[in-house]
Amino acid sequence: MTLRRRGEKATISIQEHMAIDVCPGPIRPIKQISDYFPRFPRGLPPTAAPRASAPPDAPARSPAATAGPRSPSDGARDDDEDVDQLFGAYGASPGPSPGPSPVRPPAKPPEDEPDADGYESDDCTALGTLDFSLLYDQENNALHCTISKAKGLKPMDHNGLADPYVKLHLLPGASKANKLRTKTLRNTLNPSWNETLTYYGITDEDMIRKTLRISVCDEDKFRHNEFIGETRVPLKKLKPNHTKTFSICLEKQLPVDKAEDKSLEERGRILISLKYSSQKQGLLVGIVRCAHLAAMDANGYSDPYVKTYLKPDVDKKSKHKTAVKKKTLNPEFNEEFCYEIKHGDLAKKTLEVTVWDYDIGKSNDFIGGVVLGINAKGERLKHWFDCLKNKDKRIERWHTLTNEIPGAVLSD
């Protein structure tokens, strides 16, 4: 081996080169110098096809001479850069080392991070978030929707603020009948409503097939109200009698399937109470409320009232009628009528309940009806028999209105 003097350039013969560990530290014999050079280009996995190794007369680069000239015979430029990375950039110190430095695998590309300009991130930033909770009261057939607050809403007015309110819509269903809304809060992008809206007449079947659409809108006195964002919750995600809390990013407006909406549209529902009173010797029929009634007027509402008949009615004296509730599709009546009749005769009777829309100067419009009695089926039959079997006990049930009543005169 030729020793280097001060100021002279080190020279190593090829024989010595093939028998020396070029890494700093004690000189150790090795099998072949190529063990310390990557056999694949930077960035490719080890299974990639190896590049052609450098010719045996290519001079090796020691850590002390990483900045020295490279041999023109070494055509694998990428391999040389990898060597610089492995032996130079990783800082091999000139001190003694217990052994040869291991070959570091090529750095893995960083994992994809969420795109700050992506759809979800953009909606959360531009449209805002909404906090609310839902509770299905199975015993009372009610869905309670508590709208808590919103944060970071999109500015809609010239002053950089908005006048937000929240609108609820049960899908599928008649538009006006299934919509509820909160109060409007003025000049804020972070409104706090803490308001509970309730849908009545919700059945287990509704919880399986319906979806709650929650929209945040900006109220405008001089123009149409503007849409800010929405979210949708399939009701089948809720457990009966358990409150579920949500904090959701608002999304852009989604289309409503009008065909499906129309095919599943109902005439409405009615909550009826039945009780046979031993004291009054009669049947007490309570008209509690209606929900999701069909709109019969041009303004998208109805002016509903309810009529009841106990048939057969030879003397035609069994007709009772509630008061008219103006401009509503979810009227609350809380009226009760008494039919004097022996308990044993009820098995031969049929209770007919019909809902009407009151119109001034023309015929009233039939909205829907329901018949309870021995010839009824399903829940209507069960409700009637439960009343007969449980004297002096008030039994309330929701019933779906139909647009046809067998044997009924559908005119008022």
From Swiss-Prot:
Keywords: Calcium, Calcium/phospholipid-binding, Cell membrane, Cytoplasm, Membrane, Metal-binding, Phosphoprotein, Repeat. Residues 112-123 have a biased composition (Acidic residues). Residues 95-108 have a biased composition (Pro residues). The keyword Zinc-finger does not apply. SUPFAM superfamilies: C2 domain (Calcium/lipid-binding domain, CaLB). It comes from the Eukaryota. Changing residue 319 to E: Loss of calcium-independent binding to liposomes. Loss of interaction with the SNARE complex and altered fusion-promoting activity. Changing residue 222 to A: Loss of calcium-dependent binding to liposomes and altered fusion-promoting activity. Expressed in brain; highly enriched in neurons. InterPro entries: C2_dom, C2_domain_sf, Doc2, Rabphilin/DOC2/Noc2, Rabphilin_Doc2_C2A, Synaptotagmin. Ca(2+) 2 binds at residues 297, 303, 357, 359. Residues 1-36 are annotated as: Negatively regulates targeting to plasma membrane. CDD domains: C2A_Rabphilin_Doc2 (cd04035), C2B_Rabphilin_Doc2 (cd08384). GO terms for cellular component: cytoplasm; extrinsic component of synaptic vesicle membrane; glutamatergic synapse; plasma membrane; synapse. Ca(2+) 1 binds at residues 157, 163, 218, 220. It is found in: Cytoplasm; Cytoplasmic granule; Cell membrane. Ca(2+) 3 binds at residues 297, 357, 359, 365. Residues 38-123 are annotated as: Disordered. Residues 49-73 have a biased composition (Low complexity). Residues 257-375 are annotated as: Mediates interaction with STXBP3. The modification Phosphoserine is found at residue 411. C2 domain 1 is involved in binding calcium and phospholipids. C2 domain 2 may also play a role in the calcium-dependent targeting to membranes. This is Double C2-like domain-containing protein beta. It comes from Rattus norvegicus (Rat). The lineage of its organism: Eukaryota, Metazoa, Chordata, Craniata, Vertebrata. The gene is Doc2b.
